Each structure stands twice: as structure tokens, then as C-alpha cells.
UniProtKB/Swiss-Prot annotation:
The protein, known as: WD repeat-containing protein on Y chromosome
Gene3D superfamilies: EF-hand (1.10.238.10), YVTN repeat-like/Quinoprotein amine dehydrogenase (2.130.10.10)
Annotated stretches, region: Disordered: 910-929, 1033-1217
A Pfam family recorded for this sequence: WD40
Comp. bias (Polar residues): 1041-1054, 1085-1107, 1137-1179, 1198-1210
Organism classification: Eukaryota, Metazoa, Ecdysozoa, Arthropoda, Hexapoda
Keywords carried by this UniProt record: Repeat, WD repeat
PANTHER family xref list: EF-HAND CALCIUM BINDING DOMAIN 8, WD40 REPEAT DOMAIN 95
WD repeat windows: 155-199, 323-362, 366-405, 456-495, 508-547, 595-635, 740-779, 823-862
Entry keyword annotation includes Transcription regulation: no
Length: 1217
């Protein structure tokens, strides 16, 4: 949307330019032109006589000023001109008596406090909350277990009744709901209708309870019965009366006769016998008026003949009878307003003065059934009534008019349910409806100021304008409201509802307002709606002056009002011109040439020079304002290319066809524009995908030359392009105006001298750009005082690190970004600037219009319930040194930059750097001097400084370890852990010394041992080489055999121990592929394991658990197991593993044991620490598959640990055991 601020005219130039001129001094503007505070009744009478004696009873500008001076009312030239324009509503520069009196009346109406409390939305606008009652039968009674009394003392009444700070809906503040059903069941609910507990009790028919929170007077318990009697029990709230806790008595039962006899001395009884002749329908005791109210229904009209006392008010010994036909079913007493609202079977709602019982002050009609519930909101001046058909009506308490009819309960509650109970919670402003269901209806809920500052409109704000003549702000919204605000006091002056409407099937539908502007003298308001309608308003008296329309169901996106002409454009893709000359207003409008191929999104005007329009497809056309002829055409995708202003016959035909298709199918206007262009013609417009234009702005102070950038074009890509509207000008520069992906500028404004550019983005950011030296010739550029800008804009001050907004423009010298902050949660649709007080205002899609200082301080939201800041139209806002608050909704999502700009506080960050030695010595001397002075003149405070106080316990220094329960088969949490496979480790190159001993046989260095091996010794005798007895054929007793091939039998070892075939313990060590190491507790054995006899514990391996593989070419071999017990097999730490190669068959079986330490008595086979490592390579095939085998341990010792055996089996066919 475009904001048009201009003033022009060819007649009465003195009045126009003296009023709207930007050269008026501040001294001339300080005097208020308001006449209401300076005129008296005698002066008004003398003015009336002057008007009657004037020719034709009208006076001109000079004559009217003379008349005011004759009655001692003197104004300056500037102030009087403003006053005359306000009075002259007919726009003829002549004033009569009716215009003068109308101006005075409207001024006094603006000061009426009742106009401030008119609601923007319906009293009941939120959806009701429905839930089950959890009772077996329908609810017969509903009440509130109160914590706070409804009867608030008058001295405690404040002006903050319409807003809350949160937390009021807790049970401690709002109490609990209590429901009862016919089966005697009680249920307690929270304020949010969450069940708390239930109980069983006997039902009670009619009861009322009155109390004060501070306990100033006795509490009253009022009882009404079927016979028309009323009884009152009074007791002190401090002594709790009958509710005292007595030991051993959980329930106290007594009769009324016992109470009268004084069985409970704390109770003060009082009774009114036969107060009514019928059943008591409702009772209430007012502590403020010290009066009892009791009502009854008198349905027997023949018996009472309409003279029944429907309601009786008893105060001391005085009785006031409110006689109502058919009696009273329900009533409500408002002690703040001193009124009484009654409702009965006659379908009428009556409003009474509590002290006048002769006749009601008002009778509200409109219900079609008997009234079953009434209540009053004195803060909102509203009366609510509910009839038998479950219809809720809302009435204005002062005007006695109907505001709303709410029939949603009819849809929710079944038609067979008629006995419905109602209760109004005055603290939460909620109406509770109980039957088979529980329904919660919010009635004018309070504003939560901890969440929001309030709303300006009931729908998104579309246009915000500032009127320099009346010095007020006008807001237009999508709710079809026009509201006039006084920005200096924050009050709402005028509200106009249902401004644009249309009739659909007999129902009046509101139409959204999408564009607005003022006339050149800023006396009238022009608005455009989504259905193509235009209206001219005299918004001071809410009168429509003229109705117009561009085209049916074509949205108006921009309106321009210049002298004698009105321009409107929108989805009809052309400019429509209306006459504003007296006598020719109602002629046919003029249609400009249709050169656009898509919907027009925005437009702006340069007075006396030209108009610019832009479309969704990125087309920009410059028009002559005098003739309406286009002279330049561009496309934002290729701004340097000039497009010829000529439509071919084929292009016109396609444009008409696309328009006809879009109107029939209801397609979007953006898609319709693409249908009108052939694929081969897209290249003429710059790109395949069109980029839409969101806003345009003319800089009024820049001349029309080809070197001056006078038009700013905002694109949906976040870029702002600058053009010259000269005939030989064009695209000059462009810059990025956002710092987030997907954001774009939706509205732009500037100050009076075009020094700053104010932009509002789709993400709710407000940015201010310094454009004094941007896109102008070098000779006209001026010096920029950066220290002054840093004083005005805290955003420019340095920080430790660059924020997002600064990082985006760090390589962009011009224009300079001087401020950036988040002002709204949603898109900003309109923005404007007030020059003298330096106030920036923004209207957003979040229903609010907010005021800011130029430096970014938050002033307030129009329509807020909080106190307003003191502002003046003649003083700059934000000069006083006081803390500024943040909007509650922005405070929760604000970045560090937004917090700094809005609050105006920058935290100081100091980087500590090492200082030279001399500086540190000087500082040490200064500190020593200060310490001496402190010891002489000052004493430190004694400990503890705080005296006796509670100290928080310190944090525990003990590390809290997590212990997992491993007694089960598995821990479930492990199944959720992501385990990454380990990488294959590369083998290190074999050292040369190891390669030399590969061919050596380590058995050549050992001496055969005769007899048993002593396990207590760790060394093995090594014989000399010339005494070695070697046998290649087989094994002899007492000889050690070494074999490294598959074909030689009896050369294997189990668990890394040499095989002993005889009692003499002939040792033999053999290894297959991998080495034996004590560090890993791992041994490898060949395919033919044999038995091992030793002193270690026996370990048996089952045939089904220990599997071996055979060589495919050889005969099958079965694995043998040994009953030998082996607790652990290890070597000394300094001994290296010994391995031999198996050349015949690569298939092997490996045994893996846990490295559990054993006792000294356990048998182990070890090598000497001094033995040299000997290893041989094994030519093994790569297809080896590991298989885990669980051993069976027989008779383990106490320290025996389970042994895990891993076998590596080749992928060949297994033999059966």
C-alpha cells in the first residue's frame, strides 16, 4: 500500500501553503488553535448575533477573524488559518453559523469518556470451551468456591479493571468451580475446567454467601426455602463460625431450632417469615448497601393480577417492593453503578435504580423466551441476558441498545436439555453453562498486558495516515473500520464501523479497506476497498460525502488525490480518474490507457510532474500527471532495458482473453498475467519468472534530472531499486534492504527533507537509511557528521562483533543503515513519519499500530489499556532521560540489536589486554596509597555483613556416577544407541630384525625337560645348539617336536600350552595364524586339538560348541576336546607373542579368554622375559568368519572367571559332530 503525503492547489494558495507548508517555524506552531477551551456562553451569544447580521448569514476568512477578535479571541496568522480550515467543512472558504456550531459539538464529543470504551470487537467473540461434566445426571447447580469476594470495596476500585498481569486464572486467585447433580455428587474444577476432586453430599436448593476479603464485616449466609421464607446466618470470618474444626467431629448436623436456641454461639441468626408467597427463586445480600434482595415467580396471574412483588429489597426495617408481572426469576445487583437488573418469565429485561422501585429506568426487549440468567459488566457498561432458548443477548448499559445476539449455545446443547444452569465469574469474565456438558463462554475478557499491549483494530491494519491539519492519526483496517486517534494522549476520538459493505443473500458483509489518502487540504479522507468501491469521508463527523467505484470485484490497491482530480488503480490494470470539481463530481470517470499486463500493486505521485505505477509482474510505467500519457516503461528484472510503449493487436487480444478466463475461473491475478504473455514474448520483459513490486516512493524534494534518483522501487526479493523519473533517465542503482532470507520491504516513507528512508518489512523489521548523499551528483554531496548520527542512533555505535543487520551492509557504503529493529511480530503494511516531534508510526498485520521515536524508542500502541506517555506535537519525543519499555510480544523474540535499539542501552564490553610493567607498577602504588587512606579514615564492615541470614547450600563436589543394572540379560537403553562400525586398522610395516628371524625355529633354542615342569619357576632351560636332538618323523618320549605345516600331526596346542603326550611333560608349542599374548588373553590352536594335562583348573568344550573346519581336499577331521581346566594362559609382559605359520590349511580355531588374574598356585605356561620374539606368517584365506562359542566350565574355583572362546571358521560346509 502507498502512503501519499502532499499538499497542492491553485486557488487560495495562501491558506493552503501557510497551513501545510514545511517552512513554518516552531514558535508559530506552539499555539493551539482549539477554540473549545477559550469560548464562553456570552461570547458564543455575541458570535451568534454577528452571524445573523452578516450578509446571507455567511462570512469569509477575514470577516470571521474580525468577529473572533471582537469577542477577545485572538490567534496568530498560522494558527487562525488552521482553525478556519477545520471549521470550513463545505470546502467553499465560507463559514456559516451551522458549520461553526457543528465544529464545537464534534470537539466536545471527542472529549466524551464513553467514546473511549466502545469495543472494536463483539463482546462474545471467542469460541466456547466445551467438556463433559462427568456426572451421571444433568448438573442441577453450579457455583464458585470463591477466594475473592465479588463485592469489592469502593476504595479498592482502580482504573486497571480492564487489563490483567497474568496469573489471575490460578485457583489461589480465581477460586474453583463446584458442580452438583441430582444423585448428590459434587465435583470441583479448576478455572480451566480441569477436574480436581469429587465428593458426595445432599443437595441444597437456594443459597447465597456474602463476605469481604479483609473481614471488615460479618459474613452472611442467606437461605431461601419453598415457603417464601428467608433466613440469614451471620458470623465473624476470623472465628469461622460453624466451619470451625472440632477434634473428633468431621461433620456437624443441626436444625434451625438449634440455631435459634444458641447451640452454636458464634452464629447470629435472623429470619424473614413469609417474605414472599411463592418459592424463593434467588437471594442476594449486599454488604455495601447492607440490604437483602429476594425474588420469586408469580405465575398465577388470576390470583395476583399482575401486582405481585416480584423482588423485595429489605434494608434494616424498610422494604421496597419492585412490582413486576409474573415475578422475577433472576436478578443482578451492581453496587458500582447502583443499579438492579431483573429478568423473568415475561421475556423482558428491566434496569432499575436500587433506590427507585416505582418504575424501571429502562426495559430491554428482544428475547422470545423467559429470562433465566442476567449479569452486568460495570467496567464495560454492558448487560448480558440469557433466555430459556439458550440465546445470549448483550446490551449497552447507557444507550440501552442491543450490541450482539449470540446463539452458539443452541448448536452445542441438545434441544431436549432445558434445565440449564448459569454462573458468571466476574473476576475471569467467564460465563459457565452447565447441563450434560460444561461450556465456558468468555465475555469481554481482560487484556493480558504481560503478553500484549492491546490491539488497535480487530483485524490487520492496512493503512496508517497522519493528518497535519487536525494533528491526529487515522488508521484503516481489514475489519472495515476507520478510527481517528489522538497520538498525544493516546485516546480514540472517532470510530467508524462498517465503512465498506455489500449485501450477499440478504446479509450485510464488511469489505476490507485496502487503500486510503487525504485531499490536498487534508480535510477529507478517501478510502478504497477490496470490492473496487471508493468513498470520500468527512471523518470528523463520520459522514460519507461521495461514493465511487472503479470496477466490480476489482481490488483498489492505491489512491491518489491531487487538485481537482482523484486517481484510483488496482486489479483492473489501469488508472481511473475522477473529477473533484464542484458540479462535475458525478460524471463518468476517465480511463487511462491500459498498458499494464498485470494487476497494479502500488503507485505514487510527484506533484506537478508525474505518476509511477508498478505491477505484480515487475512492470514500471511513468505517466505525465497533466495528460495521463506514459513516457517510460521498465521491467525490474532488466531495469537497464527500455521497453517500447506500444501494444500490438495480438497482445491486446491475449490480455482480454486472460482477463475473461480469470474472471470465470476466479483465478489469481498473478497467474492471469502469465497467461496473457506468450513464451516467446517473455524475453521482452526481462526474465522467465516475474518479480513483483511491493512499494514505490517518490522523493518530493529531489529535482527531475537524469542524475538524481527520485523514485525508490521495492521488490519482493528484498532489493530496492532507484530510478530517475526524467524522460532520459532510468535505472541508477540498487541496494539490499533486508538481512533475512525471504524478507522484503512492503512499505516506505521519508521525512519532509528526504534525509532518511523508513522501511517496513514482511518480517516486522523497521529500518532507517541515511539517503542524503545517495544517488545524487558528486557536486551536491554534503559532509555527514558521524558523531551526531551516533548520538541520535544507538545502532551505529560499535560492538564487539557485527550483528546480522550490520554484516549484511558492511560492504555497502551507501545508503547508510542507521537503525534496524523488530517492531512487530508480523508484516508491516504501512509506515509514516511526523516531522516536528520526530515520531515514527507503523501499522502491522498483528492488529496493532505502534509509535516510535526516530532513534527507535517504543512510545506505545494505539488502543492500549496502559497509561500513555506524555507527548507534544511541538516537542521532540524521546528527549527525556528515562527508561523505555519494550513491547511484551517483541521482548520474547527480540535479538540483541533490537533490545539495544528499543531500550536505548548499550552494555559496555571491556577487553582486558596485558599492560606494560611500568603501568602495572604505577597502578600498584596508587592502590597502596588508597589502601592506607582506607585504613585511616574507613573501617571495613564486620562479618557477617548481612547479619543472621540463610545461606544456600553449596553445590556438591562429589561426582555423581551413573550405575547401570546389569543383572538382567540386556539393558534396554543400549538398543537405542547408535554404534558406528570401527575402521580397519592398517598394519604397520614389519621391522627388519623381525624379518630376519622369520625362518628360524624357536624350538632350536630350547632344551628338552625330563620330568614335570615346575610351575613356580619362570625360566626354561635353554640347551646349546650342538646338543639338540631333532626328529622329523614323529615325536619320541622326552623330545620336543616342532611343526609348522598342516600335514605333520601331533604338533598342535590348546590354549597356547605345548602338548604333553607323556607324564614326562614333553612340551610342544604351536600357533596358527595369530600370536599368543598375555595382554589380550588370546590363544590360537590348529584343527586337531589334543588333551592338555596340567595343574590348572579343567575347562571342557562341548563338541557342539567348538567347531572346526577341515581342508576341502583332505579327509574330514573331528574336533576333540580336553577336560583340562585352564583358568588363564598368559605370558610375562616383556615376552612377545610367538606365532607360527600354517601353510597347509588356513582354517583355524581361536580361543579368547578374559584376562583375569589368578593365584600363585594356578598353573601357567610362561616364557622367559629374555626370550627373543619369533613369529612366522600364515598364508590364510580372506574368507574367515568369526563365531562366538560359550564354554562349559566344570567345577571352577572361586576366582575363576568365565572364558569366552572365539573361533574363526572358513566358509565351507560343516561336518556333523
Amino acid at each position: 500500500m502507498s502512503l501519499i503525503y502532499f499538499a497542492s492547489g491553485d486557488s487560495h494558495a495562501n491558506i493552503e501553503y501557510q497551513t501545510i507548508s514545511s517552512t513554518a517555524t516552531e514558535a508559530n506552531q506552539e499555539q493551539s488553535e482549539r477554540l473549545h477551551d477559550r469560548i464562553s456562553k456570552a461570547q458564543l451569544q455575541r458570535l451568534y448575533e454577528r452571524f445573523k447580521s452578516a450578509p446571507d448569514q455567511v462570512v469569509g476568512c477575514a470577516d470571521f477573524r474580525r468577529m473572533l477578535e471582537e469577542v477577545d479571541i485572538v490567534f496568530s496568522d498560522f494558527t487562525y488559518t488552521r482553525l478556519f480550515l477545520k471549521i470550513n467543512q463545505n470546502h467553499d472558504f465560507l463559514v456559516d453559523w451551522n458549520e461553526f456550531v457543528s465544529y464545537l459539538i464534534f470537539g466536545f464529543q471527542e472529549e466524551d469518556p464513553s467514546s473511549q470504551k466502545e469495543s472494536l470487537i463483539m463482546p462474545i467473540s471467542a469460541a466456547p470451551v466445551v467438556r463433559k461434566t462427568e456426572h451421571r445426571s444433568a448438573v442441577c447447580c453450579i457455583t464458585l468456591l470463591k477466594v475473592k469476594s465479588d463485592q469489592t470495596p469502593l476504595e479498592d476500585m482502580t482504573e486497571s479493571a480492564n487489563y490483567s498481569f497474568g496469573g489471575e486464572d490460578s485457583p489461589e486467585n480465581s477460586g474453583m468451580w463446584v458442580t452438583a447433580s441430582h444423585e448428590g455428587q459434587l465435583r470441583f474444577w479448576s478455572a480451566h475446567m480441569e477436574p480436581l476432586r469429587s465428593a458426595v453430599s445432599e443437595s441444597i436448593y437456594c443459597m447465597s454467601y456474602a463476605f469481604y476479603n479483609n473481614g471488615k464485616t460479618h459474613s452472611k449466609l442467606v437461605l431461601g426455602d419453598y415457603a417464601g421464607n428467608v433466613r440469614i446466618l451471620s458470623y465473624s470470618p476470623y472465628l469461622r463460625g460453624p466451619f470451625q474444626a472440632k477434634p473428633g467431629a468431621a461433620l456437624v448436623e443441626l436444625t434451625w431450632a438449634d440455631v435459634l436456641r444458641g447451640r452454636i454461639p458464634l452464629l447470629i441468626p435472623k429470619e424473614y417469615i413469609n417474605l414472599h408467597n411463592e418459592l424463593i427463586s434467588c437471594v442476594y445480600y449486599s454488604l455495601h448497601m447492607n440490604a437483602l434482595f429476594a425474588s420469586a415467580e408469580y405465575r398465577n396471574t388470576k390470583k395476583y393480577r399482575g401486582r405481585c412483588p416480584g423482588l423485595i429489597m429489605v434494608s434494616n426495617d424498610d422494604r421496597n417492593n419492585f412490582r413486576i408481572p409474573l415475578g422475577v426469576s433472576v436478578f443482578y445487583v451492581s453496587e458500582v453503578k447502583n443499579i438492579l437488573v431483573t429478568g423473568g418469565p415475561d421475556t423482558f429485561v428491566r434496569i432499575w435504580d436500587v433506590y427507585i422501585s416505582s418504575e424501571p429506568s429502562a426495559i430491554l426487549t428482544g428475547h422470545n423466551g423467559g429470562i433465566v440468567a442476567v449479569f452486568v459488566q460495570p467496567e464495560e457498561n454492558k448487560v448480558y441476558s440469557v433466555d430459556y432458548h439458550k440465546i445470549i443477548k448483550v446490551w449497552d448499559l447507557q444507550e440501552h441498545t442491543l450490541l450482539q445476539t449470540y446463539g452458539e449455545l443452541v448448536r452445542i446443547i441438545h434441544h431436549s436439555e432445558m434445565d440449564i444452569k448459569y454462573y458468571y465469574h466476574s473476576h475471569l469474565r467467564e460465563l459457565m453453562v452447565a447441563g450434560r456438558k460444561l461450556i465456558q463462554v468468555k465475555c469481554c475478557p481482560r487484556v493480558r498486558v504481560d503478553l500484549t499491549d492491546g490491539n488497535t483494530h480487530a483485524a490487520p491494519v492496512s493503512v496508517v495516515l497522519y493528518n497535519r491539519l487536525f494533528r491526529n492519526i487515522v488508521t484503516c483496517g481489514l475489519d472495515s473500520y476507520i478510527i481517528v486517534w489522538d497520538p498525544w494522549t493516546g485516546r480514540r476520538k472517532i470510530i467508524m464501523k462498517n465503512c465498506h459493505t455489500k449485501m450477499i443473500y440478504g446479509e450485510t458483509i464488511d469489505i476490507e479497506i485496502t487503500a486510503a489518502c487525504f485531499d490536498p487540504l487534508e480535510q477529507f479522507l478517501l478510502t478504497g476497498a477490496r470490492d473496487g468501491s471508493l468513498k470520500i469521508w468527512n471523518y470528523n463527523n463520520s459522514v460519507v460525502v461521495r461514493n465511487m467505484s472503479i470496477q466490480m470485484d476489482q481490488e483498489v490497491t492505491a489512491v491518489i488525490w491531487v487538485v481537482d482530480r482523484i486517481l484510483a488503480m488496482g486489479w483492473d490494470r489501469q488508472v481511473t480518474e475522477f473529477n473533484d470539481v464542484e458540479g462535475r463530481e458525478y460524471g463518468d470517470p476517465k480511463k487511462w490507457a491500459k498498458f499494464h499486463t498485470d494487476d497494479i500493486t502500488c503507485a505514487d505521485v510527484k506533484l506537478g510532474e508525474g505518476v509511477v505505477t508498478a505491477t505484480y509482474s515487475g512492470e514500471i510505467i511513468f505517466w505525465k500527471l497533466e495528460t495521463g500519457q506514459p513516457y517510460r516503461r521498465y521491467n525490474v528484472m532488466d531495469p537497464s532495458q527500455f521497453i517500447e510503449l506500444k501494444l500490438t493487436a495480438e497482445e491486446e487480444k491475449l490480455s482480454r482473453r486472460s482477463k475473461r478466463i480469470s474472471s470465470l475461473l476466479g483465478a489469481n491475478r498473478r497467474s492471469a498475467s502469465m497467461l496473457a504473455i506468450k513464451p516467446d514474448e517473455i524475453k521482452d520483459y526481462g526474465a522467465n519468472i516475474p518479480v513483483s513490486v511491493q512499494a514505490v516512493l517518490f522523493l518530493q524534494k529531489r529535482p527531475m534530472t537524469k542524475d538524481h534518483g527520485s523514485v525508490f522501487i521495492s521488490l519482493d526479493t528484498g532489493i530496492i531499486q532507484v530510478y530517475s523519473h526524467h524522460q532520459h533517465g532510468g535505472h541508477i542503482k540498487e541496494f539490499i534492504a533486508v538481512h533475512k532470507v525471504g524478507d522484503c520491504v512492503l512499505t516506505m516513507a521519508t521525512d519532509r527533507k528526504n534525509r532518511f528512508l523508513y522501511t517496513g518489512t514482511a518480517f516486522g523489521y523497521i529500518k532507517i537509511w541515511h539517503i542524503v548523499n545517495y544517488c545524487i551528483p558528486e557536486a551536491e554531496k554534503t559532509h555527514v557528521c558521524m558523531p551526531k548520527l551516533r548520538l541520535d542512533f544507538i545502532f551505529l555505535r560499535k560492538e564487539l562483533f557485527l550483528t546480522r543487520a550490520k554484516r549484511m551492509v558492511r560492504n555497502q557504503p551507501e545508503p547508510m543503515l542507521v537503525s534496524s529493529y523488530k517492531g512487530h511480530l508480523k508484516a508491516i503494511n504501512s509506515i509514516g513519519f511526523i516531522n516536528l516531534p520526530k515520531i515514527l508510526f507503523s501499522g502491522s498485520h498483528d492488529y496493532s499500530c505502534r509509535l516510535w521515536t526516530q532513534s527507535g524508542r517504543y512510545l506505545g500502541t494505539l488502543g492500549t489499556v496502559l497509561p500513555w506517555s506524555k507527548l507534544s506535537p511541538f516537542e521532540r519525543a524521546g528527549e527525556e532521560n528515562r527508561p523505555y519499555r519494550l513491547p511484551p510480544d517483541i521482548k520474547k523474540v527480540a535479538s540483541s540489536t533490537t533490545l539495544k535499539v528499543i531500550s536505548g542501552v548499550q552494555h559496555s564490553f571491556q577487553v582486558k589486554r596485558p599492560k606494560p610493567t611500568e603501568e602495572r607498577e604505577d597502578e600498584g602504588e596508587v592502590e597502596d596509597t588508597g589502601t592506607e587512606m582506607k585504613n585511616i579514615f574507613d573501617r571495613p564492615l564486620r562479618e557477617p555483613i548481612l547479619g543472621k541470614h540463610f545461606e544456600l547450600p553449596g553445590r556438591s563436589a562429589i561426582e555423581q556416577r551413573i550405575e547401570l543394572d546389569t543383572t538382567q540379560l540386556y539393558v534396554p537403553i543400549y538398543s537405542h544407541l547408535r554404534v558406528h562400525p570401527s575402521d580397519v586398522m592398517e598394519n604397520l610395516p614389519t621391522p627388519p630384525i623381525i624379518g630376519q628371524v622369520k625362518s628360524e625355529n624357536y624350538l632350536d633354542h630350547y632344551m628338552p625337560v625330563v620330568g614335570k615342569v615346575d610351575p613356580n619357576t619362570s625360566a626354561i632351560n635353554i640347551r646349546e645348539p650342538n646338543k639338540v636332538i631333532r626328529s622329523k618323523a614323529g615325536g619320541q618320549v622326552g623330545q620336543a617336536r616342532a611343526s609348522s605345516t598342516w600335514g605333520k600331526p601331533k604338533t598342535n596346542s590348546i590354549l597356547g600350552m605345548p602338548r604333553a603326550e607323556s607324564s614326562q611333560g614333553k612340551a610342544r608349542a604351536s600357533s596358527a595364524k595369530a600370536g599368543v599374548s598375555s595382554g589380550y588373553g588370546r590363544t590360537n590352536f590348529g584343527p586337531n586339538p589334543s588333551r592338555v594335562r596340567s595343574n590348572s583348573p579343567k575347562v571342557s568344550f562341548m563338541p557342539s560348541q567348538l567347531k572346526t573346519c577341515r581342508k576341502p581336499e583332505s579327509s574330514p577331521r573331528k574336533a576333540k576336546t580336553s577336560p583340562a581346566r585352564a583358568k588363564s594362559v598368559s605370558f610375562p609382559a616383556k615376552a612377545n607373542p610367538v606365532s607360527t605359520s600354517a601353510k597347509a590349511n588356513p582354517t583355524c580355531t581361536s580361543v579368547k579368554t578374559n584376562p583375569v588374574p589368578t593365584s600363585a598356585k594356578a598353573s601357567r605356561v610362561s616364557t622367559s622375559a629374555k626370550s627373543n620374539p619369533v613369529s612366522t606368517s600364515a598364508n590364510a584365506k580372506p574368507d574367515i568368519m568369526p563365531v562366538k562359542i560359550k564354554p562349559v566350565v566344570k567345577k571352577p574355583s572361586r576366582n575363576t572367571a568365565p572364558v569366552q572362546i572365539t573361533t574363526s571358521i572358513a566358509k565351507t560346509k560343516k561336518d556333523k559332530p
